[in-house]
């Protein structure tokens, strides 16, 4: 195995999602079974000791693909030569915190990280923002990295995509592998819109197969959108393993391509498609090939969908305007 190792940086590496993520990256699930990796664990100073413990466990797994581990609290070191960056660490919303406070707190994290990526990452860097509010955090990081092509900054809506597939499979009795062309539109928030009008179940239109708009509006959409809160209620902690799995799926699909006859959902900088204002980072249906993605064009958007897409996009533009006022973009 003579391939050059790929440098993968994970922020918030000592957290729950980081813990669920790192072992799968090291075992080849992120990039492929023949791609060696160097891991960079980027943490805040008080997380370094826990990150060292995780690194010890990674060593103890003796993963053939894992060529090296570096732990740091300096973004300039953590992103040096990075080919893939998973920005997991973020400031969670605490009780009584206003959205503006949350955006400002995360601006203090993602703006310096974006600058470090701009100054030190490899030319082929691919960035996935997992830490919430993911879409707007990605926008903040991207704005701080003017020398990096904007399309290299993405936000994770793959967890919502996977949740929607699972709920649709449960409703119809189909296997998850039979479900194709599902779409998440908009923000990774309670306003997101999981769209089944173009989805297929074993080759048949999903909306026609379900044929139940009341279930769609009153059960399916809210269940997918509020699944994270339901998991916190049940588990006493936020979803970590499923979020890590979605991050793996997102990057793996971005690098290795979507299957023929299918697409995925990614939060990406809008080019104005489907009436989404240019520049905001919104989820779209995309196909990927050779490490690049393209928005699926020509989909007919009905009134049911249009209203919901517009509501989520409105929230994204409000978040963009808020971080602009804060001087973060």
UniProtKB/Swiss-Prot annotation:
Residues given in the record as NAD(+) binding sites: 12-18, 106, 113, 130-132
Sample GO molecular function, one term: L-malate dehydrogenase (NAD+) activity
CDD domains xref list: MDH_chloroplast-like
Function of the protein: Catalyzes the reversible oxidation of malate to oxaloacetate.
GO BP term, example: malate metabolic process
PANTHER family: MALATE DEHYDROGENASE
Keywords, sorted A to Z: NAD, Oxidoreductase, Tricarboxylic acid cycle
Cystine residue pairs: none
Cited InterPro entries: L-lactate/malate_DH (IPR001557), Lactate/malate_DH_C (IPR022383), Lactate/malate_DH_N (IPR001236), Lactate_DH/Glyco_Ohase_4_C (IPR015955), Malate_DH_AS (IPR001252), Malate_DH_type2 (IPR010945), NAD(P)-bd_dom_sf (IPR036291)
Similarity comment: Belongs to the LDH/MDH superfamily. MDH type 2 family.
Binding site for substrate: 93, 99, 132, 163
Matches recorded under Pfam families: Ldh_1_C, Ldh_1_N
Reaction(s) the record says it catalyses: (S)-malate + NAD(+) = oxaloacetate + NADH + H(+)
PROSITE patterns linked to this entry: MDH (PS00068)
SUPFAM superfamilies in the cross-refs: LDH C-terminal domain-like, NAD(P)-binding Rossmann-fold domains
Name of the protein in its database record: Malate dehydrogenase
EC number from the UniProt entry: 1.1.1.37
Residues of the active site: 188 (proton acceptor)
């Amino acid at each position: 195995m003579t391939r050059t190792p790929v440098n993968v940086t994970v922020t918030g590496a000592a957290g729950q999602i980081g813990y669920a993520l790192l072992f799968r990256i090291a075992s080849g699930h992120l990039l492929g079974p023949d791609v060696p990796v160097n891991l960079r664990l980027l943490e805040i100073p008080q997380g370094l000791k826990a990150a060292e413990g995780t690194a010890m466990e990674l060593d103890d797994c003796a993963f053939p693909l894992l060529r090296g581990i570096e732990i740091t609290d300096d973004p300039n070191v953590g992103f040096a030569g990075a080919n893939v960056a998973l920005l997991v660490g973020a400031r969670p919303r605490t009780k009584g915190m206003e959205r503006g406070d949350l955006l400002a707190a995360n601006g203090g994290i993602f703006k310096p990280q974006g600058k470090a990526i701009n100054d030190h990452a490899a030319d082929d860097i691919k960035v996935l923002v997992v830490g919430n509010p993911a879409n707007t955090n990605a926008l903040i990081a991207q704005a701080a990295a003017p020398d990096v092509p904007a399309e290299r900054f993405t936000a994770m809506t793959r967890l919502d995509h996977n949740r929607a597939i699972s709920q649709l499979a449960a409703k119809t009795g189909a296997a998850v592998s039979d479900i194709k062309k599902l779409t998440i539109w908009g923000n990774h928030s309670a306003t997101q819109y999981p769209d089944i009008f173009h989805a297929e179940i074993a080759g048949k239109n999903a909306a026609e197969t379900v044929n139940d708009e009341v279930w769609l509006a009153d059960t399916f959409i809210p269940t997918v959108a509020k699944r994270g809160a339901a998991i916190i209620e049940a588990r006493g902690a936020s979803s970590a393993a499923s979020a890590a799995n979605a991050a793996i799926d997102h990057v793996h699909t971005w690098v290795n391509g979507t299957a023929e006859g299918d697409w995925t959902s990614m939060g990406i900088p809008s080019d104005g498609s489907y009436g989404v204002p240019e520049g905001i980072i919104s989820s779209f249906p995309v196909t990927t090939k050779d490490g690049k993605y393209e928005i699926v064009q020509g989909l007919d958007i009905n009134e049911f969908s249009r209203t919901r897409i517009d509501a989520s996009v409105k929230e994204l533009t409000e978040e963009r305007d808020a971080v602009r006022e804060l001087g973060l973009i």
